[in-house]
A protein has these predicted regions:
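Low-complexity, compositionally biased segments
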Residues: 9-12, 53-55, 103, 255, ...
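Sec-dependent bacterial lipoprotein signal peptides
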Residues: 1-42
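A surface/extracellular/periplasmic glyco- and lipid-processing/surface-interacting theme
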Residues: 60, 64-101, 108-116, 122-347
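C-terminal region of N-terminal signal peptides and the immediate post-cleavage residues
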Residues: 39-62
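Small/flexible residues
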Residues: 6, 12, 19, 23-26, ...
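Generic N-terminal leader/targeting and pre-domain segments
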Residues: 15, 29-32, 48, 61-62, ...
Length: 347
């Protein structure tokens, strides 16, 4: 029997834990908190312009990046990770359908951000690009020195980013890789030219996520027409399309398409139950930034081929990927194609 709607609702839990308030306060927090983000300069950190206070118009570069290619820029096997804005004012996004993996993360005010990972394809542009969070550093350690494209970060977080085993590529570090687009107001209009950071897509070998791909389990699973996961101020719905053999994404009730009108449709969706706690960082109103713990183990749901499979996840160390097993203890394979991982709080 098909399940028409199966919701994960943690509005009350996270709303109380992280200080989600009225819409007016949330919007005020989003504006005020921008004063806390800063950018990198090439090779070092400092207090500079952030994603909200950057120049209103950064033209798209007319020529390739002119700085010499460093070993970091020519290293094979390093994927590109882009922190993507997911506020309603930022939609539709650009380049999202081309990502190999999309992680959804809770941020202040009950909102969400996306972390998109690119390895097999580099789209012409990606964005809007927004600021990084502490959780991103732990999540990205599974990759071999990835390039992280982000608009800025809270100044107290910058030393951590500077010491992390990744290439921090903010507008201050790689100004020629970014531009301000038309049609959206700042800070929702900062875009990345991936080719200015990576000379070529590194390929599947760079996706050291721990995911296995292959046929679905021959038995088990529940027929599922749609699945909804709720954050305090964001909602993700994945609806199975037998015609496309994909899950069609909708955010806050609106179908998700890119700026070039391509539907975002992953082959596999994972609802991963993790510990979400307050971090050491907070916004201007005192609301702690959520920290999503992705090292450890727990339960999960894997959606593929129109069915939902109960699973367990395990990531013993930050430098390793995450494996998923079915109830019978066998590895739970993903369908070939884009993967969305939605982090939800463990019960």
């Amino acid at each position: 029997m098909s399940t028409q709607s199966d919701n994960v609702d943690w509005v009350a839990t996270v709303g109380m834990r992280y200080g989600a308030r009225s819409r007016r306060v949330v919007l005020t927090a989003a504006v005020v908190a921008t004063s806390l983000t800063v950018s990198f300069t090439a090779g070092c950190t400092h207090r500079g312009r952030d994603d909200d206070r950057a120049p209103q118009h950064i033209p798209a570069p007319a020529s390739p990046l002119t700085r010499p290619a460093s070993p970091a820029h020519s290293t094979a096997g390093s994927p590109l990770a882009v922190k993507i804005d997911n506020a309603p004012a930022a939609r539709p996004q650009t380049g999202l359908a081309a990502a190999d993996v999309v992680y959804t993360e809770p941020v202040e005010g009950g909102l969400s951000r996306l972390l998109a990972v690119y390895a097999t394809t580099l789209p012409t542009a990606v964005g809007p690009v927004r600021s990084a969070r502490e959780s991103d550093l732990e999540l990205l350690r599974q990759f071999e020195r990835p390039a992280l494209a982000f608009s800025g970060a809270q100044h107290k977080l910058l030393p951590l980013i500077g010491r992390a085993p990744l290439r921090a590529e903010s507008p201050g570090a790689a100004p020629a890789a970014y531009y301000r687009g038309l049609g959206k107001a700042a800070p929702h209009n900062l875009y990345l030219r991936p080719a200015r950071l990576l000379s070529a897509a590194p390929g599947k070998r760079a996706l050291t996520t721990g995911f296995g791909y292959g046929p679905a389990p021959s038995s088990g699973g529940t027929r599922t027409a749609s699945r909804t996961v709720r954050y305090p101020a964001a909602r993700f719905t994945f609806t199975w399309s037998a015609q496309r053999s994909r899950w069609l994404v909708a955010m806050d009730g609106t179908p998700t398409v890119t700026t070039d009108r391509v539907p975002v449709a992953p082959a596999t969706v994972v609802v991963q139950y993790v510990r979400i706690r307050g971090s050491r960082y907070h916004d201007a109103l005192g609301n702690h930034t959520p920290y999503t713990e992705t090292v450890g183990s727990g339960s999960a749901e894997v959606l593929r081929d129109g069915r939902s499979f109960a699973a367990s996840w395990s990531r013993p160390v930050a430098t390793g990927g995450t494996t998923f097993t079915a109830r019978d203890g066998r590895p739970l394979k993903f369908a070939a194609g884009q993967v969305w991982v939605v982090f939800a709080p463990a019960p």
